[in-house]
Amino acid sequence: MKKLLRLFFPLSLRVRFLLATAAVVLVLSLAYGMVALIGYSVSFDKTTFRLLRGESNLFYTLAQWENNKLHVELPENIDKQSPTMTLIYDENGQLLWAQRDVPWLMKMIQPDWLKSNGFHEIEADVNDTSLLLSGDHSIQQQLQEVREDDDDAEMTHSVAVNVYPATSRMPKLTIVVVDTIPVELKSSYMVWSWFIYVLSANLLLVIPLLWVAAWWSLRPIEALAKEVRELEEHNRELLNPATTRELTSLVRNLNRLLKSERERYDKYRTTLTDLTHSLKTPLAVLQSTLRSLRSEKMSVSDAEPVMLEQISRISQQIGYYLHRASMRGGTLLSRELHPVAPLLDNLTSALNKVYQRKGVNISLDISPEISFVGEQNDFVEVMGNVLDNACKYCLEFVEISARQTDEHLYIVVEDDGPGIPLSKREVIFDRGQRVDTLRPGQGVGLAVAREITEQYEGKIVAGESMLGGARMEVIFGRQHSAPKDE
């Protein structure tokens, strides 16, 4: 059962369109049909009344008043089997003349009807109607079919009442004309039955037209789906921007996404290439050290720090490239709130272990209220690179201070090292540029730090420290949306 449902649900756009339009057509057809039928019924009643009134006028002209009695002489050309029956009453409601003697029908005429012109209906048993129309064989066959379906069925007869005022030759008369053929057997009544057939035929004709309309209307979507399949099969690079107005925005955004993903792929590929290139130097140093050990030119104790330093460098480079490869331009920055002091404590603790032999003395002057708004890894990456450089080039002391405004976070790192020449203070942030080429490094740490701070609309400013070395001021922007502690 579930497999069968999956074949039909969720419904395709074409099926949804067909069902919706078919429902609209059905409702409108029913509404228009009902209005037409009701209008036809009203028109039919008026037409029937006019015909019966004409019959009444005919009998009024044939009527003669002699010796206080009413005489009606029917011409020979009048069909005695006429589908109407005429009754003539005086002003007191007394029956003066009847075309035929049908007692049950005469009893159905209400006295109130005789007072004014009007159109009425009477209900008769199907057997009584059959006796009334005993001379019409075709009607008898139809009544027999009705009787077979429902022996207690009732037939409806139309009645027209016309009042004629008194004249010099004729007293006031009321002529009642009864249509002996039931409304149910008239062809006009069959319109209700034919309506179902017409509606069905209408739907059978409309649905194919709706299918064609759906096919033509949804062609742009089918073309888009085809292009997406070609993308999956790597047979095209972008979607065709020449599409309908409604799909233009979707196609444009999808093309942007495709370009972004392609750029990301290119970035991964470039990152792998850069990583491979950056590992050549530490690997070459490791190979050279191993050869020296094998030839006993270097002792294990002398080789160990060199190898550990290179292994550490390899680990740092791998971590750096993995992190950078996962970053995407235009990505929304996290708005998480992180206290600065604990993050810097963790970093300085790790750096003290790394530079334990050097004996670096790191001091922190950070207020507990100062916080960073953003991704924690970004903060650690930036400050890790800046502090690593400070520890690497300092003689002994590294000082860290911070301050915060509504819009920015300022962190200052100072050391007592050789400092940075004025001419190099901008170059050091370029990828691959280094001030001291004698020390190990790839010249990417500060470049990475600058790229991350620029994502926060910030920057890193290199200057001269009061300690005699370098002063690096790291500025993080986008701090105005920081949530406030309650």
UniProtKB/Swiss-Prot annotation:
Chain positions of site Plays a critical role in the switching between kinase and phosphatase states: 202
Main localization category: membrane
Pfam families on file: HATPase_c, PhoQ_Sensor
Reactions listed under catalytic activity: ATP + protein L-histidine = ADP + protein N-phospho-L-histidine
CDD domains: HATPase_PhoQ-like (cd16954)
Record PTM Phosphohistidine, positions in chain: 277
Function: Member of the two-component regulatory system PhoP/PhoQ involved in virulence and adaptation to low Mg(2+) environments. In low periplasmic Mg(2+), PhoQ functions as a membrane-associated protein kinase that undergoes autophosphorylation and subsequently transfers the phosphate to PhoP, which results in the expression of PhoP-activated genes (PAG) and repression of PhoP-repressed genes (PRG). In high periplasmic Mg(2+), acts as a protein phosphatase that dephosphorylates phospho-PhoP, which results in the repression of PAG and may lead to expression of some PRG.
Assembly, per entry: Homodimer.
GO CC annotations, alphabetized: plasma membrane
Membrane topology: Multi-pass membrane protein
Highest rank taxon of the organism: Bacteria
Cytoplasmic face residues: 1-16, 216-486
Ranges that cross the membrane: 17-37, 195-215
GN (gene name): phoQ
UniProt name for this protein: Virulence sensor protein PhoQ
EC number(s) stated in the UniProt entry for this protein: 2.7.13.3, 3.1.3.-
